[in-house]
């Protein structure tokens, strides 16, 4: 498969799986790519990071929107959830059977590997967008401080 066909296929999948809207549970705007239309219908932390990296090559504005949406789910203590259920009503059967660690809110209380800074850095290097960087730094700082405080109690890194 040549590069052009590969890019075309990737673009088609990412556009087909793109979800945009306003969450009825918190009024926030969202724009992200679902990993799978059936199996994984919500925003998943590390999938969004990888989607954003891929989107750098296809649609840089959507790459930024993907990370902004994920960062907008950060809690006041800095935690960014593993899954954010932006469209709660769309998959009630998924929510009733497949979520471990689901809180009363519309996100999971578990986490995935903390690769968000890498994705944000890749976007910034590709775009040079200072406003995006200025928005991301405090969110990322709070998130990594949360990890240090909550997930590393013995302080061994």
Description of each model-found segment:
Residues 1-4, 57, 134:
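Charge-dense, low-complexity intrinsically disordered segments
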Residues 1-43, 64-65, 69, 78-83:
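Low-complexity, Ser/Thr/Pro/Gly-enriched N-terminal "stalk/linker" regions
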Residues 7, 49-51, 60, 116:
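Hydrophobic alpha-helical segments
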Residues 25, 36-40, 44-46, 115-118, ...:
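Bulky hydrophobic/aromatic packing residues
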Residues 26, 37-38, 52, 102, ...:
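Residues at structural and domain junctions
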Residues 30-49, 56-57, 94-113:
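Solvent-exposed loop and edge beta-strand segments that line ligand/cofactor-binding
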Residues 48, 52-55, 120, 140:
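Hydrophobic core/packing positions within alpha-helical solenoid repeats
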Residues 60-127, 132-134, 141, 145-157:
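Helix-terminus loop motifs that line ligand-binding clefts
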């Amino acid at each position: 498969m040549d590069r052009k066909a590969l890019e075309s296929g990737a673009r088609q999948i990412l556009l087909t799986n793109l979800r945009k809207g306003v969450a009825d549970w918190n009024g926030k705007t969202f724009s992200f790519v679902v990993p799978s239309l059936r199996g994984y219908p919500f925003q998943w932390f590390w999938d969004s990071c990888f989607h954003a990296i891929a989107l750098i090559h296809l649609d840089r504005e959507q790459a930024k929107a993907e990370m902004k949406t994920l960062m907008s789910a950060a809690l006041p203590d800095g935690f960014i959830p593993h899954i954010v259920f932006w469209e709660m009503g769309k998959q009630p059967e998924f929510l009733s059977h497949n979520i471990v660690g689901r809180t009363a809110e519309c996100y999971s209380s578990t986490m995935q590997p903390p690769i968000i800074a890498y994705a944000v850095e890749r976007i910034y290097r590709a775009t040079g967008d200072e406003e995006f960087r200025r928005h991301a730094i405090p969110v990322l700082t709070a998130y990594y401080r949360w990890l240090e405080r909550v997930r590393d109690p013995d302080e061994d890194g």
